[in-house]
C-alpha cells in the first residue's frame, strides 16, 4: 500500500480579502503560516515521513511546503516545482472580490465561475497587466500554455499529465510523496483519483492547510482517504471555503 498526502496552501492574503486569486502570486498571511506549521507538526506527530515533495511555482504553496517541512525537520528533502500544479486561472476575475461579484452577478453565476467543471470565467486580454505570459517563471512555455482563463476541466487537463508522467511513477517506485498545491489543482487530482462526476465535483471544497491522506493500492487506486486532525474543524474549514462566493 502507498500513502499520498495532499495539502492546500495556508490562508493567503487574497483568501483573507476574499479575492479571486488564480495565478496571481500572493503570499501567506500570518494565519496561513501557522496553518502550514500546524500541518507539519501534525504530520510529524502522526508518524508521517516523505522522500520527495511536489509543489507549484506560486509562493503561497511553496511557502506552505517550506513551513510544513521545517516543522518536520525535513527541509533538506528534494522538491520539484511545476506550473502544472498551479491554481486554476480565474481570468478577468483575478483580483476581484468574490462577494462583490456575487452582488453584481448573483450567487449562482459566481458559483458557476468558482466550481463548475466546464465553464471558465471571462478571459484576460493578453495585453492586460495581470496576464502572466511575460512572467519569467513561464519563460520556457509556449504562450498558449499560459492560460488567459481556465475551468476545472482545463485544470485537470494540465495536472493529469504531470501526475501520470512524474508523480505516479515516483509513488509506484515506493517513494513517499507530499504535494503542496492549491484548491483547484487538488480538486483536479481528487476528481481523478476518486472518479468524481463532473456534476458532483461542484460540491467539493478543499480547506486550507489540512493534510489529506490517500491510501492507494498497487495500481494507485484509492483504498480510503481522510483528513488528519479534528473532523469538526475540517468540516467548518471546508464550509468556510464554500461560503466565499456568496453575497
From Swiss-Prot:
InterPro entries linked: His_Pase_superF_clade-1 (IPR013078), His_PPase_superfam (IPR029033), PG/BPGM_mutase_AS (IPR001345), Phosphogly_mut1 (IPR005952)
Catalytic function, reaction form: (2R)-2-phosphoglycerate = (2R)-3-phosphoglycerate
MF terms in GO: phosphoglycerate mutase activity
Active site: 9 (tele-phosphohistidine intermediate), 87 (proton donor/acceptor)
Binding locations of substrate: 8-15, 21-22, 60, 87-90, 98, 114-115, 183-184
Xref: Pfam families: His_Phos_1
Pathway involvement of the protein, from the record: Carbohydrate degradation; glycolysis; pyruvate from D-glyceraldehyde 3-phosphate: step 3/5
Keyword Nucleotide-binding attached: no
Family the entry assigns: Belongs to the phosphoglycerate mutase family. BPG-dependent PGAM subfamily.
Protein name: 2,3-bisphosphoglycerate-dependent phosphoglycerate mutase
Species whose genome carries this gene: Acidovorax sp. (strain JS42)
Lineage of origin: Bacteria, Pseudomonadati, Pseudomonadota, Betaproteobacteria, Burkholderiales
Amino acid at each position: 500500500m502507498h500513502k499520498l498526502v495532499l495539502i492546500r496552501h495556508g490562508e493567503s492574503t487574497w483568501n483573507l480579502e476574499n479575492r479571486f486569486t488564480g495565478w496571481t502570486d500572493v503570499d501567506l498571511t500570518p494565519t496561513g503560516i501557522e496553518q502550514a506549521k500546524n500541518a507539519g507538526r501534525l504530520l510529524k506527530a502522526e508518524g508521517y515521513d516523505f522522500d520527495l515533495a511536489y509543489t507549484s511555482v506560486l509562493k503561497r504553496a511553496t511557502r506552505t511546503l517550506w513551513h510544513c517541512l521545517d516543522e518536520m525537520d525535513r527541509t533538506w528533502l528534494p522538491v520539484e516545482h511545476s506550473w502544472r500544479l498551479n491554481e486554476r486561472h480565474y481570468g478577468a476575475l483575478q483580483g476581484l472580490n468574490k462577494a462583490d461579484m456575487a452582488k453584481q452577478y448573483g450567487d449562482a453565476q459566481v458559483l458557476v465561475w468558482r466550481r463548475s467543471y466546464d465553464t471558465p470565467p471571462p478571459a484576460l486580454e493578453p495585453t492586460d497587466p495581470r496576464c502572466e505570459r511575460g512572467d519569467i517563471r513561464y519563460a520556457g512555455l509556449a504562450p498558449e500554455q499560459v492560460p488567459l482563463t481556465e475551468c476545472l476541466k482545463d485544470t485537470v487537463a494540465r495536472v493529469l499529465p504531470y501526475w501520470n508522467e512524474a508523480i505516479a511513477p515516483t509513488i509506484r517506485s515506493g517513494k513517499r510523496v507530499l504535494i503542496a498545491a492549491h484548491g483547484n489543482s487538488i480538486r483536479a487530482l481528487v476528481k481523478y483519483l476518486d472518479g468524481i462526476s463532473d456534476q458532483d465535483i461542484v460540491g467539493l471544497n478543499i480547506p486550507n492547510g489540512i493534510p489529506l491522506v490517500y491510501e492507494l493500492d498497487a495500481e494507485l487506486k484509492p483504498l480510503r482517504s481522510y483528513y488528519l486532525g479534528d473532523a469538526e474543524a475540517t468540516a467548518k474549514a471546508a464550509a468556510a471555503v464554500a461560503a466565499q462566493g456568496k453575497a
